[in-house]
Amino acid sequence: MLKKIFYISGTLLLIVSIVWEYKVNILIWTIPTLMNIANPVQENIPTNWSSGPSEIQKRTDERPNIILILADDMGYNDISLHNGGAADGSLKTPNIDSLAQSGAWFSRGYAANATCAPSRASIMSGKYPTRFGYEFTPVPDASRFIVSWLVEEDDPVLRARIDSEVANSLPSFMEMGMPTEQITIAEVLRDAGYYTAHIGKWHLGHAYGMDPQSQGFEDSLTLAGSSYLPENDPEVVNAKFDTNIDRMVWTSSQYAARFNGGDLFKPDKYVTDYYTDEALKVIEKNQNRPFFLYLSHWAIHNPLQALRSDVEQMTHMSDHNLQVYSGMIAALDRSVGKVIDLSLIHI
């Protein structure tokens, strides 16, 4: 009997030690399966944006339409207006540059927070996020421990810095977000008679009342996964970094969107272009009434994925990752150009 207990205990210890030794690989193998079970993604579902008055009616409302375009994780030097742009100035962003050249250029503008979600809260609310207690980007509860495991095995130079004391003191994931009592620009404009539409990333909380439609947007096409295209799509070129955090981003990525809180579905093209085309639909459908469009691009946040056609324009760059990164910026600039062109016709 003792010998049997000894063998069982030894086997369990061996299994535990193997699992611990290969915990990162096991996580990377299991997460996609669990995500697809918990969050199944349907094939593409067409959006149904609200429409304004018929084109044949004369527009008498002279209030300006407002389009707010937000890029994610773009560096200050990535556009050619600033010090020549990415890739030592060889990447040009003429459409983005034109906004500054023909309008206002805030050369000393700063974000109200150094992390993603709180800075977005400041844009929507017009307040410093510290004023309402939203100082850190929400991270799922279990991920706080998982991330600490991941970074332990990374190169010390590239390793993410994590303040465990702060991380462990944060509210639960479902409680984190911009408080529902905060008034957003969308709520103000909606109450003033504007049609309000959101496209892309939100990142301001998952609790009841924190979604875009509860915060002033009549329609919302929301980012629901971090992939720009499936990794094996023939039209996409991928670039990866040798860090466990990047591996986890790739592992946990889904190619998904959600319209007005409905089921998850696959976009029908490269996400930057998909959001752009949907923005053009909003403009076309609402050209005869005042509207506020918040086009919140996922680009150029990782994972690094660019269209092959864009990467092929970057062959003068020697670094593969830089080629892909630049291709993502080119797609973003193309998006801005399309919105500008259509807006000049209808606004």
Regions from the language model: what does each represent?
Residues 31-104:
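Active-site-proximal N-terminal segment of extracellular/periplasmic enzymes that hydrolyze or transfer
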Residues 139-195, 202-291, 297-306, 312:
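Formylglycine-dependent
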Residues 331-342:
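Active-site neighborhood of glycoside hydrolase catalytic domains
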Residues 345-347:
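Conserved small/polar residues in nucleotide/adenosyl-binding loops
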